[in-house]
Amino acid sequence: FSGTARLSGEVMLFDETGDHPALVCADVLARLGCTVRHISPDRATAHDLGPTNSAVVLRDLASQGVTFTCFQDIEKVAQLGNRKEVTLRHVLTGETSVHVVDHVVIEHGITPMDALYHDLKAHSCNLGQIDQDAMVAGQNPLKPTQAEGGFLLARLGDAISGRNIHAALYDALRICKDI
């Protein structure tokens, strides 16, 4: 997306998340003139977008020539001259197929951005821990576990794993509703 890598030709885009990032990437690549093949291990492309958004996005991508293949996982990527040889494995049957493309792009989510949480953890009065039983019971899950520390700390959203904004807000609501 930064424009530092100039992709052209045939691009195999593997989407492990089924959300916006891979589809935006497919759009950018198609607009650059690439032939894009979107691959998903899931039963449906863009399964996390919901029916309203996915219908519009998939229509727009299809009109740009993007093709979609489901139930496929990447088994191997090997260099073949200046191209890539990609072995796909069908997730239900185990059958493999080999494809040669110019580029492979893999969307597998983000690495948690949890450095601030870990920096603050020892200074919090709950050591960054939440009471899972209390949270399940709909009670305040933030409980001090030591006298030291002047604040309660919880980790949520992208500090845990790649999440969409709705999941992060739901985390925050469940954890903070009783504060």
Task: Cite the ranges covered by each PLM segment.
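Glycine-rich dinucleotide-binding loop and its adjacent helix/turn
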Residues: 1-33, 121-164
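Conserved active-site and cofactor/substrate-binding residues in soluble primary-metabolism enzymes
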Residues: 20, 24, 52, 56, ...
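Internal hydrophobic alpha-helix adjacent to the cofactor/substrate pocket in enzyme cavities
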Residues: 25-39, 166-179
